[in-house]
């Protein structure tokens, strides 16, 4: 019994010892686990803290970049809030270029919203007048143009500054966004004819102005970024221009295609198609020839328009690029129509010929609107085509003859005749060696040669009249004292017009320029005159506005030559038309 008791007693002692050891081991394990947990927790907390610090640093840096980029815009609060309200914007912004790109993408969405709002308005608003319906369709067209321009600008920015020369990048980007701003104004301008129009305008105003401000901000940031980059480039390298111009040494530019070189070298251009009203060509109307022309053509497509009077409205849509209209002489080939505001059109839609597609050329043709002075706005030619040029063409109408709507344009050896605001719009347009004649207007009217429509100080737009002849037609000359004629008036706030090296007859009033409405734009416009001659050229009696300037420096005047103002050195040779790049 004792052994048994001893045995069990030992067994019990052994079990107790084993249990103690087991508990000790468990305790040790738990202690180690606890320590590991604490260490891991500390490390995790440290990592999370580091990650949070990194995120905060990135966010802070992105905010600083956005603030800096937006500080030079006209609407900095809108610029900043639009960007920082984008989800994860801090991950998308590492440079000023990123801010611009993001801003443009936001603007694209805003334009789309406006587009669908207009479509809905057309469907649902009762009692729209015929002109209001036309104006709303004008809005859809200009919004569509804006979307294309913004998308192209984004693509250009993604490759900036490596796709092409820095200067070309700069001019292209400024032109695209300047045109986008103009399009918003054009939409609203269609609703400015009567009180009913203005009610519809009020519905569209907020959305259109929002897009315009967003585009304005993008343009300001582009100007700031590119000005800095150009300054840096000039420090690093001496100015050089490897592109040789025909004007300089008789050689063709290296970027001109072989096909276009052959076309320009030929004394007689072989057309791709012929338009003849008498049925002797491929088509009877110009419109039909345009419809059948290839889209997005990379080579020149020549449409010869034989002698005749073509009574039609012609629209060259944006996809019909590189079209050239070649007439049989401006006295022989005439395209004419008579749409006008008085009969229910908008100014934009009244044009006999409208050109939107890029690189459209015309020579030896008359564009005419025969509506007459009593019908008010009636456009003969509306040009929104970038890198477009006109040679030996006549533009004949009364009020609003030539609408230089948007983009870069060049007119050489042309005649423009009209009455009120007969060269108007917001393109970057240069007239060289042209005749610009005021006609006899309606009773009580004054003639205004120009009405330039720049709305933003950063737009690269304006009207330049260089080496031209400004005078009067035969019907005005005998009665010109009864109908005062002026060089221009400010259609929009930052209106810009320069008259230089031109002959001006006494048809122009000594004051030279006329106000639009009281003091509107007199301080913000820029009206320059340089080295003009003739009885109407003296500047001593000119208006004393802050925005008027007599230019005395040839260096300053150079800024308004084709080579500088419309980057003519990179494209005018490809037209085959005569031109001078400088003074």
From Swiss-Prot:
GO terms for biological process: cell wall modification; pectin catabolic process. Its EC number is 3.1.1.11. The keyword Signal applies. Pfam families: Pectinesterase, PMEI. GO terms for cellular component: extracellular region. It is found in: Secreted, Cell wall. GO terms for molecular function: pectinesterase activity; pectinesterase inhibitor activity. Residues 1-40 form the signal peptide. Pathway: Glycan metabolism; pectin degradation; 2-dehydro-3-deoxy-D-gluconate from pectin: step 1/5. The record marks 399 as: Transition state stabilizer. Glycans are attached at residues 85, 105, 224. It comes from the Eukaryota. InterPro entries: Invertase/methylesterase_inhib, Pectin_lyas_fold, Pectin_lyase_fold/virulence, Pectinesterase_Asp_AS, Pectinesterase_cat, Pectinesterase_inhib_dom, Pectinesterase_Tyr_AS. It catalyses: [(1->4)-alpha-D-galacturonosyl methyl ester](n) + n H2O = [(1->4)-alpha-D-galacturonosyl](n) + n methanol + n H(+). Keywords: Aspartyl esterase, Cell wall, Cell wall biogenesis/degradation, Disulfide bond, Glycoprotein, Hydrolase, Secreted, Signal. The active site is at residues 400, 421. Substrate binds at residues 347, 377, 489, 491. The PMEI region may act as an autoinhibitory domain and prevent untimely PME activity during transport. Acts in the modification of cell walls via demethylesterification of cell wall pectin. This is Pectinesterase/pectinesterase inhibitor U1. It comes from Solanum lycopersicum (Tomato). The gene is PMEU1.
């Amino acid at each position: 019994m004792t052994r048994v008791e001893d045995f069990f007693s030992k067994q019990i002692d052994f079990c107790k010892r084993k249990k103690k050891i087991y508990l000790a081991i468990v305790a040790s394990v738990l202690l180690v686990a606890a320590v590991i947990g604490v260490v891991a927790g500390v490390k995790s907390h440290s990592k999370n803290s580091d990650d949070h610090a990194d995120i905060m640093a990135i966010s802070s840096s992105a905010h600083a970049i956005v603030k800096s980029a937006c500080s030079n815009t006209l609407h900095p609060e809108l610029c900043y809030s639009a960007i920082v309200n984008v989800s994860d914007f801090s991950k998308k912004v590492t440079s000023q270029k990123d801010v611009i790109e993001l801003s443009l993408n936001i603007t694209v969405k805003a334009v789309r919203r406006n587009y669908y709002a207009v479509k809905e308005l057309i469907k649902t608003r009762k009692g729209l007048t015929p002109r209001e319906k036309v104006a709303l369709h004008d809005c859809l067209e200009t919004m569509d143009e804006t979307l294309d321009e913004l998308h192209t600008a984004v693509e250009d920015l993604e490759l900036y500054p490596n796709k092409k020369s820095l200067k070309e990048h700069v001019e292209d980007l400024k032109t695209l966004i300047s045109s986008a701003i103009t399009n918003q104004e054009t939409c609203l301008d269609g609703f400015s004819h009567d009180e009913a129009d203005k009610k519809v305008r009020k519905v569209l105003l907020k959305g259109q102005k929002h897009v315009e401000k967003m585009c304005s901000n993008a343009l300001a940031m582009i100007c700031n970024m590119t000005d800095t980059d150009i300054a840096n480039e000039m420090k690093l390298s001496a100015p050089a221009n490897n592109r040789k111009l025909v004007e300089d040494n008789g050689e063709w530019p290296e970027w001109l295609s072989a096909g276009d070189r052959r076309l320009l070298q030929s004394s007689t251009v072989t057309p791709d198609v012929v338009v003849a009203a008498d049925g002797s060509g491929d088509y009877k109307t110009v419109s039909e020839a345009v419809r059948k022309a290839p889209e997005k053509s990379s080579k020149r497509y020549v449409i010869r328009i034989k002698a005749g009077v073509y009574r039609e409205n012609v629209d060259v849509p944006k996809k019909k690029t590189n079209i050239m209209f070649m007439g049989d002489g401006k006295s022989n080939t005439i395209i004419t129509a008579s749409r006008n505001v008085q009969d229910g059109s908008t100014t934009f839609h009244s044009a006999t010929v409208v050109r939107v597609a890029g690189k459209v050329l015309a020579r030896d043709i008359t564009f005419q609107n025969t509506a007459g002075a009593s019908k008010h706005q009636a456009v003969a030619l509306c040009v929104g085509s970038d890198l477009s040029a006109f040679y030996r063409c006549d533009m004949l109408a009364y009020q609003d003859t030539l609408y230089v709507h948007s983009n870069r344009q060049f007119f050489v050896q042309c005649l423009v005749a009209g009455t009120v605001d007969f060269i108007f719009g917001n393109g970057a347009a240069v007239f060289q060696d042209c005749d610009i004649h005021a006609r006899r207007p309606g009773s009580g009217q004054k003639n205004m040669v120009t009405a330039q429509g720049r709305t933003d100080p950063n737009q690269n737009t304006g009207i330049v009249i260089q080496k031209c002849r400004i005078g009067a037609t035969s019907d005005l000359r005998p009665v010109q004292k009864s109908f005062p004629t002026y060089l221009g008036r400010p259609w929009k706030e930052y209106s810009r017009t320069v008259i230089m090296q031109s002959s001006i007859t006494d048809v122009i009033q000594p004051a030279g320029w006329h106000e639009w409405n009281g003091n509107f734009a007199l301080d913000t416009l820029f009206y320059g005159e340089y080295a003009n001659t003739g009885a109407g050229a003296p500047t001593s009696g000119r208006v004393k506005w802050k925005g008027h300037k007599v230019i005395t420096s040839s260096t300053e005047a150079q800024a308004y030559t084709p080579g500088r103002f419309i980057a003519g050195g990179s494209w005018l040779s490809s037209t085959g038309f005569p031109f001078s790049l400088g003074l």
